[in-house]
Each structure stands twice: as C-alpha cells, then as structure tokens.
C-alpha cells in the first residue's frame, strides 16, 4: 500500500495538474478531497489541452477517480466534463462520495449577488456557488449526493431550501426568484446520469488500502487559500491543507509521501494581499509568456516574485517532504530574478506571514536578487545541463526551505519534466 499527496503551496495555479497527470500513470486511484468547479486543472497531452474543474487531474491516465466528501459538486459541470472525456474516447471509472454536497442554481445566484453587493470590498470569487454551498453544509441544511438517490427526499429538501433562498433573493437582493419545477426537472435529468457513481467512497478506499493499491490524493487550490490559514477573508471556502484528507477516510498517518507544488514565481486571482506583486512590463511579460489566466474564469492572474514565506508556511502546515518546481522556463530572458525572504513593516522584520490583512497590505518585501538566465530551458532533460543561474535559483530555494526539489517541470507537456529523485519515477 502506497499513498501519495499533492498539495499546492501558494494561491493555487501552481501546476498541480501536470504533475498529478504525470504521476497518475502508475496510480490505481486518484482522490480529490476539497473544493468544487472553482478550481481548474490544465493538462496538455499530445498537443491537446484538457481543462478540468471537477474531475481529478489523474483521469487521463486511466486511474479510478474519487470525488470525496469534502468536494462540492455542480452536476451540470460534472456531466459536461464526463461527456468531454467520452468525446475524446477516454474511459474512466468515477465514484462520487454520497456525503459530497451538491451545488444548486440558487447557490450560484447568491454567490453572484453577494459579490455585487460588496462592491469595492468584493473578494473576487469565481461566482460558481462554492461559498454558499459550503455555508449550507456548515449550517447543516445542504443537499448531499445521497439525497439524490431518493427522489422524495430530494424533492423535500429542495422545497425547504428553495423557499428560504428565494426569500433572501427577493427581499434582500430584490431579484427574481427561482422556479421549483424548473430546478427539479433539470436535476432529475442529472440524477439519471450520475446516480450510478454515487456511493460510500470511504469503503472503496479502505478496500483499496487493504489490498495494497496505490492512491494519489489531489488537493485543489493552494495553502494560502485555506479557509483557516490563508489570507482571510480573501480565501476559498474549504480546507486546502493535507489535514482535510481525513474527510476522504484516509488517515494522515497512512500518507507515505507529501509533495508540494511550487511555481517559480507567484500568482493569485482576485483581491487580497499580494506582497511580491510585480506591476508593470515584467509582470505583464511573465503573465503573457506563462499564459497566466484563470482556467476557470479566464481572468488575468496577478503576478509576483516567489515568496519563500508562503512556501515555508505550506511545508510546515502540510509536513511536505518533497517539492516540485514548475514554470522555471517562463523566467528566462529576465535580467534580474527576485526571491522574497522576509517582510518589513515599520522597522520590524517578519520571517512569518502576519495574520492581519491590514499589515500584509502594507509590508515591504525583502528580496534576494539573482542574475537571470537567457537560455531557453524547455528542452533540457538533465539537471546538470541547466544554466548555472537557474541552478543557483533552485538550490537557494532548497537551502532556505530545507526540502528537496525532487521534480522540475519545464513545460506543460508530460515529457518536459526532470526528476532529481528516482522515488517519483518508481512509484
């Protein structure tokens, strides 16, 4: 039995999808434990780009896919992704936790209306209904996948929820209410398609563990978006840390290797503190070259220099024992590269991330400056062949954070990968 976990160390969009896709060729099960279709995974195979928002990235390699209890599921989006796989002749076996909560049309509308009401104080959500769905989960009023298996229960819960949500939509937001029969009709069609996959996924995973199967746990988004430990309130609505994997029925003690994905620079989507943000031509150059646009919303991502405080925090919270560095190839032909090693505020040096967003908005980054490299490194397949400037950048990160960079990704394609630790080739 071997269980591996892949976790984003920044604000998401680190390149987890490519790494997971590569590793999944030897995996029996790939498990997603958090988030919904607010997360996007981009994978390039044979020059064809696949973008998934709900399905785990390992789906293209034939691994059995599990959407765990911590995932919130928009059935319409899931069906669309499954149809895309079928269209491309990709076979997959999917299991949906009967404990997973279901995103409803009123969740999406409330997400949109709430963002509009906040005005300049908006968080920058994807408006996919994620937050309102998790709110119903915490409030213990949400509709779960298991409820879809008994139409009478689903009808009753839909009626109760819709009455409440329509009152909010009409009286607080002065917006047109939803029609019960319209939603019921639409979701009955979804149920007919998806009900075969809804099951007790903890039992499936327990059987897989007991029979020695190889399991890959896939985190969505990143540590700095965690609802508890991220830059609150500019965070997602779920736990993104490895501790959330317990919700899948897998004890953390059983996870053999935990690899954190680090992008060679920083990016984030939406509002919130971003200490190392690069405004101007260099940031624009990195964004365009790296195609840094949200795979879910297509919004341009904000670009910044690599911030080691976020990486150290992620390593500590997730007990990461390996790192994968992605998109180093995007940084060629930049004269000076910077890595943030600390923050400064009113004469005080911070070697950790302050909790207060008000402080974070005003700290100044303390940088270590590196000479850039001009060479196009995308076709390099051995670490020794990298420019010395690129190796200095990599090895400085390793020394500062105390964890080996075991994998280097130098492009979106599977083959553009350098392994510095054979463990990840031989899983």
From Swiss-Prot:
It catalyses: IMP + L-aspartate + GTP = N(6)-(1,2-dicarboxyethyl)-AMP + GDP + phosphate + 2 H(+). Mg(2+) binds at residues 13, 40. It is found in: Cytoplasm. Binds 1 Mg(2+) ion per subunit. The active site is at residues 13, 41. Its main location: cytoplasm. SMART domains: Adenylsucc_synt. This is Adenylosuccinate synthetase. It comes from Borrelia turicatae (strain 91E135). PANTHER family: ADENYLOSUCCINATE SYNTHETASE. Pathway: Purine metabolism; AMP biosynthesis via de novo pathway; AMP from IMP: step 1/2.
